[in-house]
Amino acid sequence: MAYSTDHDVVLDFPILIGDIGGTNARFAIVVDSYAEPREFPVVQTADFATIEDAIQTAILDQTHLIPRSAVLAVAGPVNGDEIDLTNSNWVVRPREMMAHLGFSDIVVLNDFEAQALAVVALGEEHLEKIGGNVAETVGSRVVLGPGTGLGVAGLVHARRTWIPVPGEGGHMDLGPRTARDEQIFPHLERIEGRVSGEQVLCGRGLVNLYRAIAKADAKEAAFSSPAEITTAGLAQADEIAVETLNLFVTYLGRVAGDLGLVFMSRGGVFLTGGIAQKIVPALKNSLFRAAFEDKAPHNELMASMPVYVITHPLAALHGLAAYARTPARFGVETAGRRWRLR
């Protein structure tokens, strides 16, 4: 199928927008080009057998609005008419959704494409800066977020258009660099023999790292959830949790720095999601920035590159709303990812 974008095609309002993650799904309806999205309560994906059930019960049955179009962001690659979600049992079948829910037009994007779209739609009040110089107005950007997994997407500016670049950067290799790393990495759980960024830099990865540190030191792991570990680490209440959080932000700095180099992100590197928002105090210590900038021979470049934590609680929906209102602002590839009634 030929490359296609939405420069000359608009979506019919009202538009349902949805950010579908591995654990939670967030929905809103955009009534027109000027209205703020009408948001709905967060949906737990485990509470519904299918996405159609969730949309019908949690959204359509709760409003008099009848969406004509839908723009959905899903956790995982978008390929074909059946889209499996990473870390969820839901399968997105746009043609079935059109038949059962009455949509005439559906666009499905990667969830971190939506996060990338949000980067140019959010104001400074929703960004917490973590060092670096002033961002270049049209400089390339990259977004990464530890959550259920580790999402990554780029955003580049060309021909007066912002172009999101989705990918699976969270599955890049993550290796040891220090003597302490060498002690800990043998105890990390692996996937087919390898440690990727997502094996450490996400919720379950935080637990993986915590347990590996405990095993390396022959100590008992007292906590079993990411929330317990981050809370204890931030409060300096548990020695293993403190080291876990310190190493977590160090490894996140390394990966964020690598991605900043890949995209030459003079427009900024953006951290998103609930974990990043919760650990801002840890990100502001010197460990994250030191790891981020330790990219010889480009240390000076990295020292100038700004990093931000996105603090908006519904950033992806904000990005989807911006796209739904003015598709021409963004060079979103829709070939193979848009379904319309003829």
From Swiss-Prot:
GO: which molecular function terms?
Answer: ATP binding; D-glucose binding; glucokinase activity
Enzyme Commission code(s) on record: 2.7.1.2
* Family annotation (CDD domains): ASKHA_NBD_GLK (cd24008)
- Can you supply a Gene Ontology BP term from the record? glycolytic process
Keywords of this entry: ATP-binding, Cytoplasm, Glycolysis, Kinase, Nucleotide-binding, Transferase
Record has rRNA-binding as a keyword: no
Where does the UniProt annotation locate this protein? Answer: Cytoplasm
GO-annotated cellular components: cytosol
Q: Which residues bind ATP?
A: 18-23
| Chemical reaction(s) catalysed | D-glucose + ATP = D-glucose 6-phosphate + ADP + H(+)
Which InterPro entries does the annotation name?
ATPase_NBD, Bacterial_glucokinase, Glucokinase
Protein family: Belongs to the bacterial glucokinase family.
| Protein name as catalogued | Glucokinase
UniProt source species: Chelativorans sp. (strain BNC1)
